[in-house]
Amino acid sequence: MALTISAQLDKFVSSYVEHAKGEGLKIAFDSEWPSPCYEETAKDGELVEWAPKRQSPPLSFNNVEDALSLKLHADYCCYFTTYYSDNLKAKAPQGDCELLQVFNREDFERLQQNLIGHLLMKQRLNQAPTLFFGLTDEEDFILTVINETGEVALEQVGQAPTQILANSLAEFIEQLSPLNA
């Protein structure tokens, strides 16, 4: 039986953290960008250990859905409302990618603003709504969820999706291997 997006995300995050064992996950500390992910405090710019942390309570896309009169795909919402985390680098069958994540509440608000801009652009171009969640190693290509179907697609910014990569976000994440920087 296929895992849900929540279970698949848990599995990938666990393997990501496990893959970093030894050297650990490091990030430059920023006192003006607080996050539950920081394992310690330090002077701004110093490297500190971090780890993905479960959101409690989970964040919500209700304001985006209300503003655009559009129901966002449930898997997409779950993907961004499960963990606080730095972006997660991964290897997919098609190449390297970076899974976008939210580091704190302010980062989530920025994601929502960018998503609204993306959806309004899609509307202006008379294209079906897609929801971005990742970057690729090819400039101008992003990973998106097709809102209507939940399929994961490769999309050039400003264009309709060109290639279906997986039937669902959970199926896509299942194919990934962690790449810790």
Curated annotation (Swiss-Prot):
Role, per record: Interacts with the SecY protein in vivo. May bind preferentially to an uncomplexed state of SecY, thus functioning either as a chelating agent for excess SecY in the cell or as a regulatory factor that negatively controls the translocase function.
Lineage: Bacteria, Pseudomonadati, Pseudomonadota, Gammaproteobacteria, Alteromonadales
Pfam families, per database record: Syd
UniProt keyword Hydrolase present: no
Gene: syd
Topological category with respect to the lipid bilayer: Peripheral membrane protein
Homology family: Belongs to the Syd family.
Keyword Cell inner membrane on entry: yes
GO cellular component: cytoplasmic side of plasma membrane
Protein name, UniProt field: Protein Syd
Subcellular localization(s) per the UniProt record: Cell inner membrane
Record key words, sorted: Cell inner membrane, Cell membrane, Membrane
